[in-house]
């Protein structure tokens, strides 16, 4: 089952965290969920060239805090903060005057090992008619050079303008999708080519986390066995 399910959702509360952090009931839940979708879509469209990996939304009773993880914080902030202020004002109008909107920027130190950015980079190259094999091999090589324990990239669609759609993938290193303690990063992007849409998926293994001794089973000797009746 670990081969099919979304790796991030599969590892929630283990070594991954939610990207929407708030509580609601009834009709209020649907309203806030729709607001989250609109805000994420608007930020991604406005910051299309800023290499945005993920957007985390936290809500309190009268405030919304949005954390944007990006590899190019300078493009997000803009000259004297003009770009980020324009985005904040739009989101403020969306949430209403009674809700305070704050935006934080977090820089991604190693974009070469970020699964979402890798998938988007491969998709951009496919739109520029770069060979899918060359794009995938280059992304895998760079990620392994930057310290990833393993990476897998999968492209599906009319690759190379073929009449019949197919899927091609490359993998290097270890990518254990069924091991929950392994922090697998996952990203997805779409390349809109002349022959149709090509889906790009990326899995990155960012090193096994050390399991704490409290959660591990004791390795001491077993006690004497109870004799059978």
Curated annotation (Swiss-Prot):
Residues 39-109 form the KH type-2 domain. CDD domains: KH-II_30S_S3. Residues 210-229 are annotated as: Disordered. GO terms for molecular function: mRNA binding; rRNA binding; structural constituent of ribosome. One of its GO terms (cellular component) is cytosolic small ribosomal subunit. SUPFAM superfamilies: Prokaryotic type KH domain (KH-domain type II), Ribosomal protein S3 C-terminal domain. InterPro entries: KH_dom, KH_dom-like_a/b, KH_dom_type_2, KH_sf_prok-type, Ribosomal_S3_C_sf, Ribosomal_uS3_bac-typ, Ribosomal_uS3_C, Ribosomal_uS3_CS. One of its GO terms (biological process) is translation. The keyword RNA-binding applies. Binds the lower part of the 30S subunit head. Binds mRNA in the 70S ribosome, positioning it for translation. Belongs to the universal ribosomal protein uS3 family. HAMAP family: Ribosomal_uS3_B (MF_01309_B). Part of the 30S ribosomal subunit. Forms a tight complex with proteins S10 and S14. PANTHER family: 30S/40S RIBOSOMAL PROTEIN S3, SMALL RIBOSOMAL SUBUNIT PROTEIN US3C. This is Small ribosomal subunit protein uS3. The lineage of its organism: Bacteria, Pseudomonadati, Verrucomicrobiota, Verrucomicrobiia, Verrucomicrobiales. The gene is rpsC.
């Amino acid at each position: 089952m670990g081969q099919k399910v979304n790796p991030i959702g599969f590892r929630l509360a283990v070594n991954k965290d939610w990207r929407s952090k708030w509580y609601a009931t009834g009709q209020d839940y649907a309203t806030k969920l729709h607001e989250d979708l609109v805000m994420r879509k608007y930020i991604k469209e406005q910051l299309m060239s800023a290499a945005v990996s993920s957007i985390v939304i936290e809500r309190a009773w009268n405030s919304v805090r949005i954390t944007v993880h990006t590899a190019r914080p300078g493009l997000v902030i803009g000259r004297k903060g003009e770009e980020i202020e324009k985005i904040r004002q739009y989101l403020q109008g969306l949430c209403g005057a009674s809700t305070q909107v704050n935006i934080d920027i977090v820089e991604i130190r190693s974009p070469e090992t970020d699964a979402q950015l890798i998938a988007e980079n491969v998709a951009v190259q496919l739109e520029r008619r770069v060979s899918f094999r060359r794009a995938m091999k280059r992304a895998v090589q760079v990620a392994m050079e930057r310290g990833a324990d393993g990476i897998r990239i999968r492209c599906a669609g009319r690759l190379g303008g073929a009449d019949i759609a197919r899927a091609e993938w490359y993998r290097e290193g270890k990518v254990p999708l069924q091991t929950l303690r392994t922090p697998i990063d996952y990203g997805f992007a779409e390349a809109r080519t002349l022959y149709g849409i090509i889906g790009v998926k990326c899995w990155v293994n960012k090193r096994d986390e050390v399991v704490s001794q409290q959660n591990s089973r004791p390795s001491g000797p077993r006690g004497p066995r109870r004799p059978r009746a």
